[in-house]
Swiss-Prot record:
<dbReference type="GO" id="GO:0050708">
    <property type="term" value="P:regulation of protein secretion"/>
</dbReference>
<dbReference type="Pfam" id="PF06456">
    <property type="entry name" value="Arfaptin"/>
</dbReference>
<dbReference type="GO" id="GO:0070273">
    <property type="term" value="F:phosphatidylinositol-4-phosphate binding"/>
</dbReference>
<keyword id="KW-0007">Acetylation</keyword>
<keyword id="KW-0472">Membrane</keyword>
<dbReference type="GO" id="GO:0034315">
    <property type="term" value="P:regulation of Arp2/3 complex-mediated actin nucleation"/>
</dbReference>
<feature type="compositionally biased region" description="Basic and acidic residues">
    <location>
        <begin position="22"/>
        <end position="35"/>
    </location>
</feature>
<feature type="modified residue" description="Phosphoserine">
    <location>
        <position position="125"/>
    </location>
</feature>
<dbReference type="InterPro" id="IPR027267">
    <property type="entry name" value="AH/BAR_dom_sf"/>
</dbReference>
<feature type="region of interest" description="Disordered">
    <location>
        <begin position="1"/>
        <end position="78"/>
    </location>
</feature>
<dbReference type="InterPro" id="IPR030798">
    <property type="entry name" value="Arfaptin_fam"/>
</dbReference>
<keyword id="KW-0597">Phosphoprotein</keyword>
<feature type="modified residue" description="Phosphoserine">
    <location>
        <position position="79"/>
    </location>
</feature>
<feature type="modified residue" description="Phosphoserine">
    <location>
        <position position="39"/>
    </location>
</feature>
<feature type="modified residue" description="Phosphoserine">
    <location>
        <position position="5"/>
    </location>
</feature>
<dbReference type="GO" id="GO:0006886">
    <property type="term" value="P:intracellular protein transport"/>
</dbReference>
<dbReference type="GO" id="GO:0005543">
    <property type="term" value="F:phospholipid binding"/>
</dbReference>
Protein backbone atom coordinates (compact mmCIF):
# COMPACT_ATOMS: atom_id res chain seq x y z
CA UNK A 1 0.00 0.00 0.00
CA UNK A 2 2.89 2.38 0.77
CA UNK A 3 4.35 1.91 -2.70
CA UNK A 4 1.13 2.77 -4.53
CA UNK A 5 1.09 6.37 -3.32
CA UNK A 6 3.98 7.66 -5.51
CA UNK A 7 2.55 5.95 -8.54
CA UNK A 8 -0.81 7.55 -8.08
CA UNK A 9 0.70 11.01 -7.67
CA UNK A 10 2.89 10.49 -10.74
CA UNK A 11 -0.05 9.26 -12.76
CA UNK A 12 -1.84 12.54 -12.15
CA UNK A 13 0.74 14.49 -14.28
CA UNK A 14 -0.14 14.27 -18.01
CA UNK A 15 2.90 13.68 -20.25
CA UNK A 16 3.04 14.05 -24.06
CA UNK A 17 4.44 11.49 -26.41
CA UNK A 18 7.89 13.13 -26.45
CA UNK A 19 8.17 13.15 -22.63
CA UNK A 20 7.22 16.82 -21.98
CA UNK A 21 4.62 18.04 -19.58
CA UNK A 22 1.23 18.63 -21.10
CA UNK A 23 0.45 22.16 -22.23
CA UNK A 24 -2.92 22.25 -20.51
CA UNK A 25 -1.46 21.40 -17.15
CA UNK A 26 1.46 23.80 -17.70
CA UNK A 27 -0.78 26.74 -18.55
CA UNK A 28 -3.08 26.01 -15.59
CA UNK A 29 -0.24 25.89 -13.15
CA UNK A 30 1.37 29.03 -14.56
CA UNK A 31 -1.92 30.80 -13.96
CA UNK A 32 -2.00 29.55 -10.36
CA UNK A 33 1.62 30.53 -9.88
CA UNK A 34 0.94 34.08 -11.06
CA UNK A 35 -1.82 34.41 -8.49
CA UNK A 36 0.47 33.17 -5.70
CA UNK A 37 3.39 35.49 -6.59
CA UNK A 38 3.56 39.06 -5.17
CA UNK A 39 1.91 41.78 -7.21
CA UNK A 40 4.14 43.47 -9.77
CA UNK A 41 6.37 40.41 -10.27
CA UNK A 42 5.79 38.58 -13.53
CA UNK A 43 6.31 34.89 -14.13
CA UNK A 44 8.87 35.56 -16.82
CA UNK A 45 10.99 37.59 -14.38
CA UNK A 46 11.26 34.71 -11.90
CA UNK A 47 13.88 32.03 -12.33
CA UNK A 48 13.15 28.96 -10.22
CA UNK A 49 15.30 25.86 -10.40
CA UNK A 50 15.21 22.56 -8.67
CA UNK A 51 18.06 23.63 -6.36
CA UNK A 52 15.77 26.16 -4.62
CA UNK A 53 13.66 23.43 -3.01
CA UNK A 54 16.06 21.22 -1.06
CA UNK A 55 17.29 19.47 -4.27
CA UNK A 56 13.85 17.98 -4.85
CA UNK A 57 13.56 17.31 -8.60
CA UNK A 58 10.06 15.98 -8.48
CA UNK A 59 7.87 17.64 -11.09
CA UNK A 60 10.72 19.75 -12.64
CA UNK A 61 11.21 19.46 -16.40
CA UNK A 62 13.90 21.34 -18.31
CA UNK A 63 13.38 22.45 -21.89
CA UNK A 64 15.32 20.38 -24.43
CA UNK A 65 15.69 17.41 -22.11
CA UNK A 66 14.19 15.01 -24.66
CA UNK A 67 16.21 14.24 -27.77
CA UNK A 68 14.84 14.82 -31.20
CA UNK A 69 12.41 17.55 -30.24
CA UNK A 70 12.21 20.38 -32.74
CA UNK A 71 10.35 22.68 -30.33
CA UNK A 72 12.25 25.77 -29.13
CA UNK A 73 13.73 25.65 -25.65
CA UNK A 74 11.16 26.39 -22.96
CA UNK A 75 11.87 28.25 -19.73
CA UNK A 76 11.94 26.41 -16.47
CA UNK A 77 8.48 25.27 -15.49
CA UNK A 78 7.52 24.43 -11.92
CA UNK A 79 5.00 21.66 -11.45
CA UNK A 80 2.47 21.77 -8.62
CA UNK A 81 4.74 20.48 -5.88
CA UNK A 82 3.68 20.57 -2.24
CA UNK A 83 7.18 21.70 -1.23
CA UNK A 84 7.09 24.63 -3.64
CA UNK A 85 3.62 25.66 -2.55
CA UNK A 86 4.60 25.55 1.10
CA UNK A 87 7.72 27.68 0.52
CA UNK A 88 5.77 30.24 -1.50
CA UNK A 89 3.23 30.40 1.28
CA UNK A 90 5.98 30.89 3.84
CA UNK A 91 7.55 33.63 1.68
CA UNK A 92 4.25 35.52 1.36
CA UNK A 93 3.45 35.01 5.02
CA UNK A 94 6.87 36.31 5.96
CA UNK A 95 6.22 39.50 4.04
CA UNK A 96 2.86 39.95 5.77
CA UNK A 97 4.48 39.30 9.11
CA UNK A 98 7.13 41.89 8.33
CA UNK A 99 4.53 44.50 7.47
CA UNK A 100 2.69 43.84 10.71
CA UNK A 101 5.72 44.55 12.84
CA UNK A 102 4.63 48.19 13.43
CA UNK A 103 1.82 47.67 15.97
CA UNK A 104 4.30 46.14 18.40
CA UNK A 105 6.00 49.53 18.70
CA UNK A 106 2.61 51.16 19.20
CA UNK A 107 1.90 48.73 22.00
CA UNK A 108 5.09 49.86 23.71
CA UNK A 109 4.00 53.46 23.36
CA UNK A 110 0.65 52.68 24.95
CA UNK A 111 2.45 51.36 28.01
CA UNK A 112 4.23 54.68 28.63
CA UNK A 113 1.28 56.52 30.31
CA UNK A 114 0.70 53.52 32.55
CA UNK A 115 4.35 53.54 33.58
CA UNK A 116 4.17 57.26 34.28
CA UNK A 117 1.10 56.78 36.48
CA UNK A 118 2.83 53.96 38.29
CA UNK A 119 5.82 56.21 38.93
CA UNK A 120 3.57 58.97 40.27
CA UNK A 121 1.86 56.49 42.61
CA UNK A 122 5.25 55.28 43.81
CA UNK A 123 6.44 58.82 44.57
CA UNK A 124 3.17 59.67 46.31
CA UNK A 125 3.37 56.52 48.45
CA UNK A 126 6.95 57.27 49.44
CA UNK A 127 6.14 60.87 50.31
CA UNK A 128 3.06 59.81 52.33
CA UNK A 129 5.12 57.27 54.24
CA UNK A 130 7.78 59.85 55.12
CA UNK A 131 5.22 62.43 56.25
CA UNK A 132 3.28 59.89 58.32
CA UNK A 133 6.47 58.78 60.02
CA UNK A 134 7.34 62.41 60.78
CA UNK A 135 3.89 63.11 62.28
CA UNK A 136 4.06 60.02 64.49
CA UNK A 137 7.57 60.91 65.63
CA UNK A 138 6.45 64.42 66.59
CA UNK A 139 3.44 63.15 68.54
CA UNK A 140 5.59 60.64 70.40
CA UNK A 141 8.15 63.33 71.18
CA UNK A 142 10.97 61.62 69.30
CA UNK A 143 11.25 63.82 66.23
CA UNK A 144 12.13 67.49 65.90
CA UNK A 145 9.95 70.03 64.13
CA UNK A 146 10.60 73.43 62.61
CA UNK A 147 8.75 76.19 64.47
CA UNK A 148 8.21 79.84 63.52
CA UNK A 149 7.10 81.27 66.87
CA UNK A 150 5.72 84.55 65.55
CA UNK A 151 3.81 82.95 62.70
CA UNK A 152 2.48 80.12 64.86
CA UNK A 153 1.15 82.66 67.39
CA UNK A 154 -0.69 84.57 64.66
CA UNK A 155 -2.24 81.35 63.35
CA UNK A 156 -3.43 80.36 66.83
CA UNK A 157 -5.02 83.78 67.34
CA UNK A 158 -6.76 83.52 63.97
CA UNK A 159 -8.25 80.13 64.78
CA UNK A 160 -9.40 81.32 68.19
CA UNK A 161 -11.00 84.43 66.70
CA UNK A 162 -12.75 82.35 64.07
CA UNK A 163 -14.46 80.29 66.77
CA UNK A 164 -15.58 83.45 68.56
CA UNK A 165 -16.88 85.01 65.36
CA UNK A 166 -18.81 81.84 64.61
CA UNK A 167 -20.43 82.09 68.04
CA UNK A 168 -21.42 85.73 67.41
CA UNK A 169 -22.82 84.72 64.04
CA UNK A 170 -24.89 81.96 65.61
CA UNK A 171 -26.32 84.30 68.28
CA UNK A 172 -27.12 86.99 65.71
CA UNK A 173 -29.00 84.45 63.61
CA UNK A 174 -30.99 83.42 66.68
CA UNK A 175 -31.83 87.07 67.38
CA UNK A 176 -32.92 87.55 63.79
CA UNK A 177 -35.22 84.54 63.97
CA UNK A 178 -36.80 85.69 67.22
CA UNK A 179 -37.19 89.27 65.97
CA UNK A 180 -38.89 88.02 62.82
CA UNK A 181 -41.38 86.05 64.89
CA UNK A 182 -42.02 89.07 67.12
CA UNK A 183 -42.60 91.35 64.11
CA UNK A 184 -44.98 88.82 62.63
CA UNK A 185 -46.89 88.67 65.94
CA UNK A 186 -47.03 92.47 66.19
CA UNK A 187 -48.53 92.67 62.71
CA UNK A 188 -51.23 90.18 63.61
CA UNK A 189 -51.91 91.99 66.88
CA UNK A 190 -52.18 95.34 65.10
CA UNK A 191 -54.65 93.90 62.57
CA UNK A 192 -56.74 92.47 65.42
CA UNK A 193 -56.84 95.83 67.24
CA UNK A 194 -57.80 97.62 64.03
CA UNK A 195 -60.65 95.20 63.40
CA UNK A 196 -62.00 95.64 66.93
CA UNK A 197 -61.77 99.43 66.69
CA UNK A 198 -64.22 99.31 63.79
CA UNK A 199 -66.63 96.96 65.50
CA UNK A 200 -66.51 98.36 69.06
CA UNK A 201 -67.76 101.95 68.98
CA UNK A 202 -67.31 102.52 72.70
CA UNK A 203 -63.62 101.40 72.52
CA UNK A 204 -62.87 102.77 69.07
CA UNK A 205 -60.10 105.14 70.16
CA UNK A 206 -58.40 102.71 72.55
CA UNK A 207 -58.26 99.90 70.01
CA UNK A 208 -57.22 102.38 67.34
CA UNK A 209 -54.08 103.82 68.97
CA UNK A 210 -53.02 100.33 70.13
CA UNK A 211 -53.34 99.15 66.54
CA UNK A 212 -51.23 102.08 65.34
CA UNK A 213 -48.59 101.40 68.00
CA UNK A 214 -48.26 97.73 67.07
CA UNK A 215 -48.04 98.54 63.36
CA UNK A 216 -45.33 101.14 64.04
CA UNK A 217 -43.38 98.66 66.15
CA UNK A 218 -43.72 96.07 63.41
CA UNK A 219 -42.43 98.54 60.82
CA UNK A 220 -39.46 99.51 62.98
CA UNK A 221 -38.86 95.82 63.68
CA UNK A 222 -38.64 95.13 59.96
CA UNK A 223 -36.09 97.92 59.62
CA UNK A 224 -34.03 96.52 62.49
CA UNK A 225 -34.38 93.04 61.03
CA UNK A 226 -32.92 94.29 57.75
CA UNK A 227 -29.93 95.79 59.57
CA UNK A 228 -29.32 92.59 61.56
CA UNK A 229 -29.54 90.41 58.45
CA UNK A 230 -27.05 92.69 56.68
CA UNK A 231 -24.72 92.36 59.68
CA UNK A 232 -25.10 88.55 59.58
CA UNK A 233 -24.35 88.37 55.84
CA UNK A 234 -21.19 90.48 56.18
CA UNK A 235 -19.84 88.54 59.17
CA UNK A 236 -20.69 85.25 57.46
CA UNK A 237 -18.65 86.29 54.40
CA UNK A 238 -15.75 87.26 56.63
CA UNK A 239 -15.79 84.04 58.65
CA UNK A 240 -16.70 81.37 56.10
CA UNK A 241 -14.96 82.78 53.03
CA UNK A 242 -12.16 85.22 53.83
CA UNK A 243 -10.88 83.62 57.03
CA UNK A 244 -11.51 80.12 55.68
CA UNK A 245 -9.45 80.88 52.57
CA UNK A 246 -6.57 82.02 54.76
CA UNK A 247 -6.83 78.88 56.89
CA UNK A 248 -6.64 76.76 53.73
CA UNK A 249 -3.33 78.44 52.94
CA UNK A 250 -2.25 77.78 56.53
CA UNK A 251 -3.09 74.10 56.03
CA UNK A 252 -0.92 73.98 52.92
CA UNK A 253 1.86 75.67 54.88
CA UNK A 254 1.63 73.05 57.64
CA UNK A 255 1.79 70.23 55.09
CA UNK A 256 4.85 71.83 53.49
CA UNK A 257 6.44 72.11 56.95
CA UNK A 258 5.87 68.40 57.63
CA UNK A 259 7.37 67.43 54.26
CA UNK A 260 10.34 69.71 54.88
CA UNK A 261 11.01 68.19 58.31
CA UNK A 262 10.58 64.65 56.96
CA UNK A 263 13.19 65.10 54.22
CA UNK A 264 15.43 67.07 56.59
CA UNK A 265 15.40 64.13 59.01
CA UNK A 266 16.27 61.70 56.20
CA UNK A 267 19.20 63.86 55.12
CA UNK A 268 20.50 64.14 58.69
CA UNK A 269 20.34 60.36 59.14
CA UNK A 270 22.26 59.78 55.90
CA UNK A 271 24.91 62.34 56.85
CA UNK A 272 25.47 60.56 60.16
CA UNK A 273 26.15 57.28 58.35
CA UNK A 274 29.23 56.17 56.40
CA UNK A 275 30.16 57.80 53.11
CA UNK A 276 31.07 55.37 50.34
CA UNK A 277 30.25 54.66 46.72
CA UNK A 278 26.84 53.26 47.66
CA UNK A 279 25.70 56.01 50.02
CA UNK A 280 26.99 59.08 48.16
CA UNK A 281 24.33 58.89 45.38
CA UNK A 282 21.63 58.51 48.05
CA UNK A 283 22.96 61.52 49.95
CA UNK A 284 23.01 63.63 46.78
CA UNK A 285 19.45 62.63 45.92
CA UNK A 286 18.29 63.30 49.49
CA UNK A 287 20.01 66.70 49.41
CA UNK A 288 18.21 67.53 46.15
CA UNK A 289 14.79 66.55 47.54
CA UNK A 290 15.48 68.43 50.77
CA UNK A 291 16.29 71.59 48.82
CA UNK A 292 13.07 71.30 46.80
CA UNK A 293 10.90 70.98 49.91
CA UNK A 294 12.81 73.73 51.70
CA UNK A 295 12.01 76.16 48.87
CA UNK A 296 8.37 75.05 48.97
CA UNK A 297 8.24 75.57 52.74
CA UNK A 298 9.78 79.04 52.51
CA UNK A 299 7.32 80.04 49.79
CA UNK A 300 4.28 78.84 51.76
CA UNK A 301 5.50 80.60 54.90
CA UNK A 302 5.81 83.85 52.95
CA UNK A 303 2.31 83.38 51.46
CA UNK A 304 0.78 82.80 54.90
CA UNK A 305 2.44 85.91 56.33
CA UNK A 306 1.11 88.07 53.49
CA UNK A 307 -2.41 86.63 53.75
CA UNK A 308 -2.52 87.11 57.51
CA UNK A 309 -1.52 90.73 57.09
CA UNK A 310 -4.20 91.47 54.48
CA UNK A 311 -6.79 89.50 56.45
CA UNK A 312 -6.17 91.58 59.56
CA UNK A 313 -6.60 94.82 57.63
CA UNK A 314 -9.77 93.60 55.92
CA UNK A 315 -11.21 92.20 59.16
CA UNK A 316 -10.77 95.49 61.04
CA UNK A 317 -12.37 97.47 58.23
CA UNK A 318 -15.39 95.16 57.85
CA UNK A 319 -16.09 94.66 61.55
CA UNK A 320 -15.74 98.35 62.36
CA UNK A 321 -18.51 99.22 59.89
CA UNK A 322 -20.74 96.30 60.83
CA UNK A 323 -20.46 96.86 64.57
CA UNK A 324 -21.30 100.55 64.13
CA UNK A 325 -24.35 99.59 62.06
CA UNK A 326 -25.51 97.03 64.63
CA UNK A 327 -25.14 99.45 67.54
CA UNK A 328 -26.89 102.38 65.84
CA UNK A 329 -29.79 100.26 64.57
CA UNK A 330 -30.47 98.56 67.91
CA UNK A 331 -30.18 101.83 69.86
CA UNK A 332 -32.54 103.68 67.52
CA UNK A 333 -35.07 100.84 67.57
CA UNK A 334 -35.36 100.58 71.34
CA UNK A 335 -35.36 104.37 71.67
CA UNK A 336 -38.34 104.49 69.36
CA UNK A 337 -36.53 106.87 67.03
CA UNK A 338 -37.85 105.80 63.67
CA UNK A 339 -36.14 108.63 61.80
CA UNK A 340 -32.70 107.83 63.19
CA UNK A 341 -33.23 104.13 62.42
CA UNK A 342 -33.96 104.89 58.79
CA UNK A 343 -30.97 107.23 58.56
CA UNK A 344 -28.73 104.51 59.95
CA UNK A 345 -29.75 102.12 57.17
CA UNK A 346 -29.15 104.80 54.54
CA UNK A 347 -25.74 105.56 56.02
CA UNK A 348 -24.62 101.95 55.64
CA UNK A 349 -26.39 101.46 52.27
CA UNK A 350 -28.76 98.80 53.57
CA UNK A 351 -31.72 98.14 51.29
CA UNK A 352 -34.85 96.64 52.80
CA UNK A 353 -36.91 94.13 50.90
CA UNK A 354 -40.49 95.24 50.43
CA UNK A 355 -42.90 92.46 51.45
CA UNK A 356 -44.54 90.83 48.44
CA UNK A 357 -42.13 92.42 45.95
CA UNK A 358 -39.56 90.24 44.23
CA UNK A 359 -35.99 91.37 43.71
CA UNK A 360 -35.36 93.12 40.37
CA UNK A 361 -33.86 91.07 37.59
CA UNK A 362 -30.39 91.72 36.27
CA UNK A 363 -31.91 93.40 33.20
CA UNK A 364 -33.79 95.89 35.39
CA UNK A 365 -30.64 96.62 37.38
CA UNK A 366 -28.85 97.61 34.18
Amino acid sequence: MAEESPKNSAAEIPVTSNGEVGDAHEHGYNRDLKHSLPSGLGLSETQITSHGFDSTKEGVTEAGASQGSSAPPLPCVLSPSRVAASQLTQHAGGQRTHTKGGPVILADEIKNPAMEKLELVRKWSLNTYKCTRQIISEKLGRGSRTVDLELEAQIDILRDNKKKYENILKLAQTLSTQLFQMVHTQKQLGDAFADLSLKSLELHEEFGYNADTQKLLAKNGETLLGAINFFIASVNTLVNKTIEDTLMTVKQYENARIEYDAYRTDLEELNLGPRDANTLPKIEQSQHLFQIHKEKYDKMRSDVSVKLKFLEENKVKVLRNQLALFHSAVAAYFAGNQKQLEQTLKQFHVKLKTPGVDAPSWLEEQ
